[in-house]
Structures are given as C-alpha cells and as structure tokens.
C-alpha cells in the first residue's frame, strides 16, 4: 500500500520576479490592493493606488532591490527555496511522506498553484505554515484568505491545518537568542515590521506578540532591561504606524550614549529587502551619520539548522 502524502505550504507574502519597475509593479498591484494590507474604502484607495503609487513607486524602489538581488533571484525567493529544500531533505529522512513547497501570497510560486499540485498528488492533508511568527491580520490573515480563495471552486478539499503563530515557541526563541552574542557596550534593537496603529486599536494583537517575543528572547539571551529595546520599521503612507519608528530610534540612540548597536528582526523568517537593504544598508547609514561608532545586523534564521528544526517541529506535531 502506498504511503499517504502530506502537503506543506511554507508561505511568505511575495517578491518581484526581477529587479525591474514592471516586475515590481506586478507584485505591488495585488499586494497593495488587498484590503487586509490597506483597508481604506476601495472607491478612495483605488484612484490613489493606480494613479499615484503604481506608476511611481516601482521606479523609486527598483535601485533598492538591485542593491540586494542575487544570482538566484530576490533574497526572499532564494531564502524561501533554501528553506524548502532543507525542510524537504529533513522529512525525506523520516517515515512520513511529506511534500514541502515554498509559496507566496502575491507572487510566484503562488498558493493556488501549489494547492493544485497537492490536489493532483491526492495528499491526505495540507499544512499551511505562514512564515510570520507573530500573528497579524496584514500577514497571517491575508495568507489565510489567499489559501481559502485557492480552494473556493474545489470539490476535493482534504483536511488542513493552519498554523496561526509561533512567537512563544521555545525552539524559536532559543534559535534567535543563540544568534545575538552582544559585544562589550553593544545595545540591541529588536526591529519588527510596523503596521498602522489603527489596526492595533481595532483589535490586531500583533504588537503584543512582538513585545512578548522581544522579552522572551532577551531573557533567553541573558540580557538586562537596559541592554535592549523594540522599534517598528517599514512604515508606508501618511497614517500613524506602530511606534517607536526604527529610523527615528537609530538617530536618537547615539545621542543617548548608545553608539554600538546590534539590530535583529525576529519577525522576518528570511532575509529580504526590508532587512538587507532597509536595515543593513539604509538604516546603518542613518545610525553612523548620527554619531554611531559600530553597527551590526544579525541575519534572519533563513535555512539555518536551528530554523529548519523549528519548522520541522511545527509540522511534525500536525502529521
């Protein structure tokens, strides 16, 4: 009797296929049109998106993508494929028939394409793992919507598990804590992707997860309260976002005598534009120009053995 297969979707939001304005526009269009991401009334938002953002923003951010692009594609795509291969290799050594696929909510390889593949393989179950340790309606819920949409016209839907969050998981906390290694007189900044503050007021508990994540990692790394703090990066548009802002914090830290800095981004399961360019290049310049003496970015977990073990643990519990 053949072994039943389990299909695993490792899901990120997405990335351009090329560092060109048309490719960036192709990615941004569905991303920014999703009401989970930008929830303004469509009759107000669509004219802004199509008349002001999509015609101009791709050209503005194109050089940023070009700074960090790799021979394998965007950093996010390359890291996602690396995670897929490492996790597949892990399960190939086990007794379970697991198919692992990296997939994206707003780009290729799409969730719908992977779901179609799994249905053709007649998997006994699907496990959806959004690679966002902290829940947010802008990420985790958006991925759930995309997964549900991929099943909308299917008749043969197998059972599935959807992993809501894993920020408090000891193996996640320990994996990140082991990467820190603070040096003498070095301060640690936990930088998480921000969301509009209004979303928090309306019930999104993302920032609560972020604060708890930072606290747990700091304790695991043996840090005192004075050695670390939290900020939020990557704000977009005129609305108030979750504070304090990372770019403003980096300018203030040297004035407070914190001139040696390490930055870690626990919300990013893979290095991407927001970590490699925004944090490691642009914000490094801001910090050093403000009087900083040393700046160190601590890479995401990517396809490290500790990260693959964590992901395997999350999946194995649901087989």
Curated annotation (Swiss-Prot):
GO MF, any single term: ferrochelatase activity
UniProt KW Repressor keyword: no
Alphabetical keyword list: Cytoplasm, Heme biosynthesis, Iron, Lyase, Metal-binding, Porphyrin biosynthesis
Underlying gene: cpfC
Name by which UniProt lists this protein: Coproporphyrin III ferrochelatase
InterPro entries listed in its UniProt record: Ferrochelatase, Ferrochelatase_AS, Ferrochelatase_C, Ferrochelatase_N
EC number per UniProt: 4.99.1.9
Protein family membership: Belongs to the ferrochelatase family.
GO biological process assignments: heme biosynthetic process
Pathway: Porphyrin-containing compound metabolism; protoheme biosynthesis
Cited CDD domains: Ferrochelatase_C (cd00419), Ferrochelatase_N (cd03411)
GO cellular-component term (any): cytoplasm
Species of origin: Streptococcus mutans serotype c (strain ATCC 700610 / UA159)
HAMAP family, per database record: Ferrochelatase
Binding-site list for Fe(2+): 193, 274
Top-level lineage group: Bacteria
Catalytic reactions on record: Fe-coproporphyrin III + 2 H(+) = coproporphyrin III + Fe(2+)
Functional note: Involved in coproporphyrin-dependent heme b biosynthesis. Catalyzes the insertion of ferrous iron into coproporphyrin III to form Fe-coproporphyrin III.
Pfam families for the chain: Ferrochelatase
Location(s), subcellular: Cytoplasm
């Amino acid at each position: 009797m053949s072994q039943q297969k389990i299909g695993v979707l490792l899901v990120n939001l997405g990335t351009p296929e090329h560092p060109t304005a048309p490719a960036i526009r192709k990615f941004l269009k569905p991303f920014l049109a999703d009401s989970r991401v930008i929830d303004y009334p469509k009759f107000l938002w669509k004219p802004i998106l199509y008349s002001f953002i999509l015609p101009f923003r791709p050209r503005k951010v194109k050089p940023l993508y070009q700074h960090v692009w790799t021979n394998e594609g965007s950093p996010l795509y390359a890291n996602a494929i690396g995670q897929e291969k490492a996790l597949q290799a892990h399960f190939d050594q086990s007794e379970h028939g697991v198919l692992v696929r990296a997939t994206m909510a707003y780009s290729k390889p799409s969730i719908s394409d992977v779901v179609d593949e799994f249905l053709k393989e007649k998997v006994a179950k699907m496990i959806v793992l959004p690679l966002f340790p902290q829940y947010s309606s802008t990420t985790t819920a958006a991925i759930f919507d995309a997964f549900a949409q991929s099943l909308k016209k299917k008749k043969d839907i197998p059972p599935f598990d959807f992993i809501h969050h894993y920020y408090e998981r000891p193996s996640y906390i320990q994996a990140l804590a082991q990467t820190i290694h603070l040096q003498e007189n070095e301060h640690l900044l936990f930088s998480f992707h921000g969301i509009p503050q209004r979303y928090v007021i309306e019930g999104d508990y993302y920032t609560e997860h972020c604060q708890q994540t930072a606290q747990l990692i700091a304790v695991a790394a043996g840090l005192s309260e004075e050695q670390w703090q939290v900020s939020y990066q990557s704000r977009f548009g005129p609305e108030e976002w979750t504070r304090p802002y990372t770019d403003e914090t980096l300018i203030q830290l040297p004035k407070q005598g914190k001139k040696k800095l390490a930055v870690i981004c626990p919300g990013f399961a893979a290095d991407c534009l927001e970590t490699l360019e925004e944090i490691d290049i642009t914000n490094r310049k801001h910090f050093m120009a403000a009087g900083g003496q040393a700046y160190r970015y601590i890479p995401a977990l990517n396809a490290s053995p500790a990260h693959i073990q964590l992901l395997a643990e999350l999946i194995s519990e649901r087989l």
